[in-house]
Amino acid sequence: MNEPMIIEKIQQIIADIIESSGYLTIVETESKNSKSVSQNRIDIEMQVETKYRKRFSLLIEIKTEGQPRFARMAVSNLLDLTLNDKSLYGIFATTFVSEESKRICRDNGIGYIDLAGNCYMQFNGFFLNIEGRQNHYRKKRVLKSLFGPKSTRALRVLLCDPRRSWFVKDLAEEAKISLGQCSNVKRKLLDYEFILEKGEGRKKKFRLVKPRDLLESWSENYDYKVNTFYDYYSMLDVSTIETKVSDYLKSKNIMYAFSLTSGASLTAPFLRYKRVFLYLQDDPDKVAEELGFKRVTTGGNVTIMQPYDEGIFYGIQKIKDTWIVSDIQLYLDLKKFSERGEEAAEFLLENRIKKKW
C-alpha cells in the first residue's frame, strides 16, 4: 500500500472515530493528497471542535512502516511542529504500530493510529485508547526477510558474540553471506533499533544493543520443524546412542551437532528424555544404516535433522567431547518443543545466554 492510499484510509478512519466519540466534531480536513498541507511537513491536518466549542488541530504524520526508527522520526517532527502550542496535537499513523513504537509515542505525548483503527489520543481532557482490532495490514514481510535463512546467519553471529562491534564487511564474511545481504540485514536491524551505529563514514561500526528483543522476535518467527526430520529406532538407551553416534561421526569427520533434548542435557539439564535429536550434514539414511538404526514412521527414539540452512552449525560447541549447537540455536529449537521445551529454553537463557550480554 503506497502513501497516498494510506493517507486516504487513515483520514477516513480518524474521521469515523472522532465523529463517533460524542465529544469531538470535525470542522475541516486538509491532506497532502490535495496539496493543501504540502509545505507543513505533515500529511493530514484535521481541525476538530469539542462539545464546549474549543478548537484543536490534529497534525497527522504518516509512515509506510511502523518500526521504532520511523516512529522516532515522526515523533521528532511532530514535537517540533506542536512545540509550545497547546491547540496542536501530533499523531503518528502507519499500517501497523509496533509495541515499541507505541511506547515511544506515549512517552512523548504523541498519539498513534493504525489501519485497523487501533489508536491512542490524549489531549485537553479528551482520551481515547482502542486496542485489539484485528489488523489485516500487519505485514510480516520485513520480519520474514529479517528471519530468512541467509539473514539469520548474520543474526547468529551477532547473538553469539553480542558485545562485539562490527563493520558490515566483517559480519558478511563471518556469516558467509553477500555484502548486499548483510547491508539489508543491518538496515532492518536499525529500523527495529536492535543495533546501534557508532563512528563516521567508513569507520562506522554497529553493535547489538537489544539482544533479548532480537532473540525473542526471532523465536516468534522460528519453528524447529522447518528442518527435515528422519526418524529411527534403536534398542540402546539414549546415553549409549549419543555416545555411539558421536564417536562414529567424529571418526568419519562428518559434521553434526546435538540439539533439543540431547543438547539441553549437556547445557541445561532440565528435561528427562527418551529421544535423541541431532543435526547432520550428510545422508541420514546412510549414517543410520551404518549405526544399525531402523527407519520408522512411528515409535522412533532417534531423530536426525537435516538443517534448513548450514547456518545452524555456526557456533557449535564441544561439551564432554560431544558437539552440540550454539546456545542461541538450542534456545530457538527448544522454545516451541512440546515436552517442557519452553521451560528448558528459559533455563538456558537465564543461566547461560544472558551472562554474555
Positions of predicted regions on the chain:
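Acidic-basic catalytic patches of nuclease active cores, encompassing PD-(D/E)XK
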Residues: 1-33
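C-terminal regulatory/effector modules of DNA-binding transcriptional regulators
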Residues: 28-44, 291, 296-357
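Conserved catalytic cores of phosphodiester-cleaving nucleases, focusing on short active-site segments
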Residues: 38-83, 91, 331
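Nucleic-acid nuclease catalytic cores
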Residues: 83-109
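Charged, structured surface patches that assemble and position nucleic-acid processing machinery
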Residues: 109-121
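Short alpha-helical segments that sit at the start of domains
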Residues: 128-153
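Loop-centered beta-sheet repeat module
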Residues: 154-217
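Short gly/ser-rich loop at a beta-strand->alpha-helix junction or flexible surface loop bordering the NTP-binding
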Residues: 225-308
